[in-house]
Amino acid sequence: MSSNAKWLNKVKWDEHGLVPVIAQEVGTNDVLMFAWMNRDALAKTIETGEAIYWSRSRKKLWHKGEESGHTQKVHEVRLDCDEDVVLLKVEQVGKIACHTGRHSCFFQKFEGGAKDGDWETVEPVLKNPETIYK
């Protein structure tokens, strides 16, 4: 697939050639994670049917689950009204999306008020990350 496809040109890429991506679990609608894609990542995601992101720290394509086996099977791809955010509806293989071993990267919830509040961990570790990433 050409990374110059018309549908790729519709996406409003940022100054670094990236677009923010939200991965949402199909069925439960749980928000699993936030990541980035470049044109190649989005094209390969469509080609393979599995989520492939752009790692800003490693500066390379990142096939979600390439090390852990916790891949994301893509059921649906949506573009928001401003055409600058992508939503992936995915099946999370192994039920673990976060590198901390949790189901979702959004496992901290703000509790309390503006003066006395703090972030509380509200989701358990499903698998020790040391055993996931050897």
From Swiss-Prot:
Homodimer. It comes from Janthinobacterium sp. (strain Marseille) (Minibacterium massiliensis). Keywords: Amino-acid biosynthesis, Cytoplasm, Histidine biosynthesis, Hydrolase, Magnesium, Metal-binding, Zinc. Pathway: Amino-acid biosynthesis; L-histidine biosynthesis; L-histidine from 5-phospho-alpha-D-ribose 1-diphosphate: step 3/9. The lineage of its organism: Bacteria, Pseudomonadati, Pseudomonadota, Betaproteobacteria, Burkholderiales. This is Phosphoribosyl-AMP cyclohydrolase. One of its GO terms (cellular component) is cytoplasm. It comes from the Bacteria. Belongs to the PRA-CH family.
